[in-house]
């Protein structure tokens, strides 16, 4: 299954010079969506994953069905103020300013083997913050898994420099 061919590219969105990789075309295709979930899940079947953590919001779309396929729980990694119970959070830098992600304090137990999932890795800042938060909570990030890697932006290298393993189903050159 050629996942990459099912992803639409939109030039100059949301800003001039950006090539936006739109996974909605993949998500609406039942064959493509099923293949995506099955390909990611099959990689981790033998890795003794305890939880799948998905980064808001498209990481939820991919992460929850992967967790289902693996027979494990799903942990949403959300933006500040979006979770109803007590949370633990971590700040991270954006191009212009900063943001914060949070996880419920009871979502990750000490020793949990966690698969971190999102749709795309660009700079790696959000994934780095999420992995750091999981680690602070006592979890071990087994791997960071993405549908798309934009290697020219450097996110994979950033995560690997932090000692994290990274997997992506496909790559797109440029930004």
Curated annotation (Swiss-Prot):
<dbReference type="GO" id="GO:0006166">
    <property type="term" value="P:purine ribonucleoside salvage"/>
</dbReference>
<dbReference type="InterPro" id="IPR005764">
    <property type="entry name" value="Ade_phspho_trans"/>
</dbReference>
<dbReference type="InterPro" id="IPR000836">
    <property type="entry name" value="PRibTrfase_dom"/>
</dbReference>
<keyword id="KW-0660">Purine salvage</keyword>
<protein>
    <recommendedName>
        <fullName>Adenine phosphoribosyltransferase</fullName>
        <ecNumber>2.4.2.7</ecNumber>
    </recommendedName>
</protein>
<keyword id="KW-0963">Cytoplasm</keyword>
<dbReference type="InterPro" id="IPR029057">
    <property type="entry name" value="PRTase-like"/>
</dbReference>
<comment type="pathway">
    <text>Purine metabolism; AMP biosynthesis via salvage pathway; AMP from adenine: step 1/1.</text>
</comment>
<keyword id="KW-0808">Transferase</keyword>
<dbReference type="GO" id="GO:0006168">
    <property type="term" value="P:adenine salvage"/>
</dbReference>
<keyword id="KW-0328">Glycosyltransferase</keyword>
<dbReference type="InterPro" id="IPR050120">
    <property type="entry name" value="Adenine_PRTase"/>
</dbReference>
<dbReference type="Pfam" id="PF00156">
    <property type="entry name" value="Pribosyltran"/>
</dbReference>
<comment type="similarity">
    <text>Belongs to the purine/pyrimidine phosphoribosyltransferase family.</text>
</comment>
<dbReference type="GO" id="GO:0044209">
    <property type="term" value="P:AMP salvage"/>
</dbReference>
<dbReference type="GO" id="GO:0003999">
    <property type="term" value="F:adenine phosphoribosyltransferase activity"/>
</dbReference>
<comment type="subunit">
    <text>Homodimer.</text>
</comment>
<comment type="function">
    <text>Catalyzes a salvage reaction resulting in the formation of AMP, that is energically less costly than de novo synthesis.</text>
</comment>
<dbReference type="GO" id="GO:0005737">
    <property type="term" value="C:cytoplasm"/>
</dbReference>
